Amino acid sequence: MNIKNILTTAMLAALPAAGMAQQSSVHFDMTVIDGALKESVSNGTFTIVSQLPALSVAGVSGEAVRFDGYSNYVKAKLTKNSLSTTNLTINIILAPETFPMMNTAEAENTPTYATVFGNLDEAAKKGFAIKLSSQGHLRFTFASAYAKGYLFTIDSSEKLPLGRWSQITAVLNKDANLAALYLNGNQVGTCKMSRSEIILSEGDYYIGKDATELKAGPFLINTFCGLIDDIAIYNQSLSPAQLAAVDLSARPDFNYPPSRYASSLWRPQFHGMPSGGWTNECHGLTYSDGKYHIFFQKNANGPYMARLHWGHISSENLYKWTEEPIAIAPGEWYDIKGCWSGCVYDDDNGINAIYTAVDNGKARIVKATPDDKGLVAWTKQGVVIDGRPAGLSDDFRDPYFFASGGNKYIIVGTSKDGIGACTLHKYENGNWTNDGKIFFRGTNANQHGTFWEMPNMTDMGNGKWLFTVTPLNTGVGVRTIYWVGTINPDGTFSPLHDQPKMLEMGGISKDGYGLLSPSIYQKDGKTLLLGIVPDKLPGEVNYEMGWAHNYSLPREISLDTNNNLIQKPYAGLAAMRTGVTASVAQDLTGEISLSPVSGRQVELLGEFTVGSGEMGFDFFKSDNGKARLSYNTADGVLTLDLTKLARRSNDGGPYNGVYAATLPEKPAVGEKLKLHVFIDGSIADIFVNDKWAYSVRIFPTAVEGTGTSVFATSTTTVDVKAWTLDADKSGETGISSIWNDPAAGSERIYNAAGQQYSAIPQKGLYILKGKKYVAN
């Protein structure tokens, strides 16, 4: 450890020799036992106040407590008689994921502080505390007998690093007349003590929260978010060198373990989302170093929207996701309030990110580049577009990069004359310029909204481009729409149809329901799309859950000859299918259970020969209720009916439990209707005829509601399969529907890559009739 020892000679003389064993007077090793912490000197046990079960994770040595930033803290009663009033050392090992929120409305130019550890009573001028500000400033305050009670404060000359382990040490030495604050062994502040004794407090010690209570709605905002590994107090004045050597090089893992949600009926298992806290738009879907990556809007301090960071999850297969460390965090003058949405793109110089940097008064576009192929660490490269062009709304955000005709462009969401639009910025001579051009704009606020969020441009081939955008304040609220068109020589967009089309099938998406703000990426000949599917729950419920929102399953998209978007499930999802399966192939009148397939992670796939009456699936089924997806052959309407399901309602007003959409193309009598449904906790992704799709959030409350069935009210030929899904299941066939592909033949044999064998191989894995076998 590199330690700058700049203590005064007098203080050095008072210090014990380096390497001597030091006995603490207070020690928390931060091991969680039955939801509590033990102070090892007094053997006192103190409950961890927490909305969800208190958790420990791997620390520097042993365990560390995971503080969620909005609900959990410890209040401990320690006797002051055990502590010296002349010589003290307070030592903490911790790793902040983010800094305390303190203010949800704006970034604090004058920082306020939350207690990490201490029992400071400022009014009575007693006690001490190590504190951390909303901007990462460290502070140590202690009470002294000077002038019959005086508060001394040391402010650190360095900020506490985010996302890594650090050691904070505060040293008080009355005889040397010096107090010192250390960060990772380096002295970062001192003050004189006026040769006065320390005034201790009999008040409770707080760990992870200030003694005062500051809230935004139900959420505490003067709290610590991250890991605390160890807290110790010594009745000696020690330098960091005299404390036990600690290796701080390991990367802290801030992910909440699955046990945090063990009792949840709603937590998805194979949809992308962070391990806790708030997520909003996912952006920057890309591929690097053997993994898919999604970047997204994240508030780690709690499941509410404030001071957004760029979160990061990765996956090898688009269904088993791992959260990575925060990629980009506020901290520069231009993004002190938040790092908002943008995109990730790959150009001649490799992977880049551009994002919306927000201070308290202006939005700018900033570039960042990764430090590694895993895209874990990023370096900000500064402002590339310094605010909106003249004549546009102050709302200016969500940049997106594309290239056309040998030129590079960035479009940014905005509003012009009260209608949604996108600016156009061209890369010329090392700068992003705007000559007043608008990339594309709406013509009617009722249909096209007043502001455009999350614009996205995708080259669909044959000179056609897909432009998706999420307008605010349309006549039906927020939903995602799209145009198909061409790029003009000057970089502007010309649509091939005047009116936009809806991303989600048949108007299901309105008022902010359904899939919004898609991120699109092309790889291996596939164009993949996924987006945020908001839960539409009140903040009090998110407080109880510990998380807010998740993303859709990936969809494979393409265009038909009429420039309509075709959507079907990503074929790789078939690898989650377990051996728990059911099949029905017969003329059906009535209902048949799909047992043993049941639970909250299931796939239902059926082809129905259209005749008369209604047909479809039931799921979340119990003796007392169910969710029903049904197609009515008379009017061509597909309905998801939740009115008979015991649930936490999230759609009162817009839907009241009934999601109905007329199919764009009604199958004729004798034709096939294909329904493909993925259920995962509180989300259903529904695909129809491999053409149309929508995603819905559902929050069932009946623990026993796990059954599935297929039904038809009139005699209908059905060919149905169902599976229980498991994201941890290894292996991927690449073949999603051999069982119902007549052209494939009943006896064809495939390898794991989907290539056909002429005969059963002598060795290795092969697939016959949709099942895996191993020849040896």
Residue ranges and their predicted role:
Residues M1-Q23:
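Bacterial Sec-dependent N-terminal signal peptides
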